[in-house]
Amino acid sequence: MTLFIDGCVREQSRTRELAQAVLDTLGTSVQTVSVNSDWPAPLSRESLALRDELLHRGDLDHPLLRFARQFAAADEIVMAAPYWDLLFPAAVRAYFEAVTVSGITFRYDEHGIPHGLCRAKHFTFVTTAGGPIIGNFGFAYAEALCRGFYGIETVRCISAEGLDIVGADVPAILAEAKKGIVSAGK
């Protein structure tokens, strides 16, 4: 099963369009988590205390942990997150908070080193930007979590930038990015 994390707020999202091109190459069943419907709230004092209590009791089946369980069980993960303010929408950060759960998506060894517990071996981060992508901090953050915590071996970024620059040939830019999807492969 491929998990599609749709962090695109806009109905007509170019990031989602590019992500769909990635999904079309995979040929697997897809479960979608969308920022516009089923999405975790940012951690609060209360939800963090509940999560800590659940983990202390070993109650990993609680609904609060469903996003982490789903993420850990996925065979492949595709995330669509537009490039906003040098990162991605705040809701995407809330999603990462919900899935970064010790005992479900990673564990610490006796030296405090995290080790991944996720089934997925591939994570594809898809992003688009109206201007140039400077630093790609959103991808860097996702990549650090995937490699450093979740144990996901292959992490790649598919992007299209300059889409809102006056005179930009948006269809051509997106078509070029889509060509890169096939050549990048898994």
Kindly give the residue locations of the regions a language model identified.
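Short, well-ordered alpha-helical segments in soluble proteins
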Residues: 96-99, 103, 127, 150
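N-terminal beta1-alpha1-beta2 submodule of the flavodoxin-like/Rossmannoid cofactor-binding fold
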Residues: 1-101, 179-186
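Short histidine/acidic/glycine/proline-rich micro-motifs that form metal-
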Residues: 9-12, 130-133, 163-165
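Conserved nucleotide-sugar donor-interacting segment of glycosyltransferase catalytic cores
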Residues: 101-111
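Glycine-rich phosphate/pyrophosphate-binding loop and the adjoining helix
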Residues: 140-186
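Cofactor-binding loop segments of dinucleotide-utilizing enzymes, especially the Rossmann-like FAD-
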Residues: 7, 35, 127-128, 160
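Short, glycine-/small-residue-rich phosphate/pyrophosphate-handling segment
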Residues: 109-150
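Structured loop/turn residues at beta-strand edges in well-structured enzyme cores
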Residues: 72, 90, 118, 150-153
